[in-house]
Amino acid sequence: MTTALKETVGRYGIWSVGLRSEDPDRRGELAEAAAELEELGYGAVWLGGNSSAANAAPLIEATSKLTVGTSIQSIWQHEPDAAGPAFADLESAHPGRFLLGLGVSHAKRVEQYARPYSALVAHLDGLDAAGVPADRRLLAALGPKSLRLARDRAAGSIPYLVTPEHTAHAREILGEAPLLAPELGVIPETDPSRARALAREFLGIYLPLPNYTNNFLRHGFTEDDLSDGGSDRLVDALFAWGDETAIRAKIDAFFKAGADHLALQVLDGEHRDALPRKAWRDLAAVLLG
């Protein structure tokens, strides 16, 4: 099943907070954008924020083959008993089109946050009982324990804010079969100062979160790299920026490290709810043309 999943999602997808909007006035805009992404050749859309099957359904209905996944659905805010029927409804209407991406979120964002690994295991037990099959769920796994869980109890991992070096480490733990689909921020800016400023603006909400900073420290970065918005070394490792050649080189580094698929998040300085459709087209011309 995992081989088929890799073929279904292809090499490239789009990661977007904007595409999960619940604003009824934007439904037409979102449907049109999803249809265009499918036409451009992207294999998947990954819905950022605390997303759910309800967010995925309109995009699936607006397209014919695009895979839509949550990235992520917080285990603290969605009960397995509810996720099961939601998955079953989508699967019945659109077989094979929805992937349930799960994560433990962060202590600063969840009041009841405690023993996240044990809570994730219990959540997976609940999904088993609710009929959500392991081969249709993915984990936003960063550390070794959660990566092993993604290998053993899911179809793979959808890590966020990682480097090619983390990707190689993740592949070693996962083995060959599971899907490894990291998110990668893409900054279409050739001026180094401007590109890094955009990256640091984006990183501002993540550097206070231990899940990410601990992962950076595990993979060779220092406390100095995490200060003042992130060092050039950290920024350049985490983001693809520059001209087409530079962006393609960073993307290739992830694939060489063992990624099967990349969830590309365009960062252009606009609000995260915006839909950077021109940038998506430009990326498609480089990667899929």
Where are these regions (language model features)?
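Active-site-adjacent structural elements that line small-molecule/cofactor binding pockets in enzymes
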Residues: M1-G289
